[in-house]
Regions:
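Paired small-residue
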Residues: 92-97
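Transmembrane alpha-helix boundary/hinge residues in polytopic small-molecule transporters
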Residues: 26, 30, 57, 106-108
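Cytoplasmic membrane-interface "Motif A"-like loop-to-helix N-cap segments
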Residues: 63-76
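Intracellular juxtamembrane helix-capping segments at the cytosolic ends
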Residues: 103-114
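Helix-loop boundary and gating motifs at the non-cytosolic
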Residues: 3-48
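Membrane-water interface at transmembrane helix exits
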Residues: 32, 59-63, 113
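C-terminal ends and interior cores of transmembrane alpha-helices
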Residues: 76-91
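Central cavity-lining transmembrane alpha-helices of secondary-active solute carriers
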Residues: 41-63
């Protein structure tokens, strides 16, 4: 990979991070507008557990596997999958979005630290 492309990667992952947060906000807001309080609280909590708590196991996995490309592909697969799932099952979309968030944060952070 050329040095010029590699030097732009943190910028691209920063953009992806913003898109990831936008998608998560859209999914969670859409869910809370159409579901009761207890269901909304449950899925917001589940998103937070997966998205933030999931960063530690994903980080350990990335450290062990040492293949950033594999984790980048997972990130780029899960994020659009979350949007598509929203039209089938909002709950599945939120779960997918939480996992995508963990992968986006860990992979992007690793790329930025290189």
């Amino acid at each position: 990979m050329s040095t010029q492309i590699k030097s732009r990667q943190p910028f691209y992952w920063g953009i992806l991070h913003g898109i990831n947060d936008l998608v998560a906000g859209f999914l969670l807001a859409g869910y809370t507008l159409t579901h009761n309080y207890s269901d909304s609280f449950l899925f917001i909590s589940l998103y937070a557990i997966l998205g933030f708590g999931g960063q530690l196991p994903v980080g350990f996995w990335l450290d062990k596997k040492k293949e950033i490309r594999f984790f980048a592909k997972i990130s780029l697969f899960l994020l659009p999958l979350s949007v598509l799932l929203f039209f089938v099952s909002a709950e599945a979309a939120i779960i997918s979005s939480g996992m995508a968030s963990a992968f986006v944060h860990v992979t992007g952070g690793t790329i930025c630290l290189q």
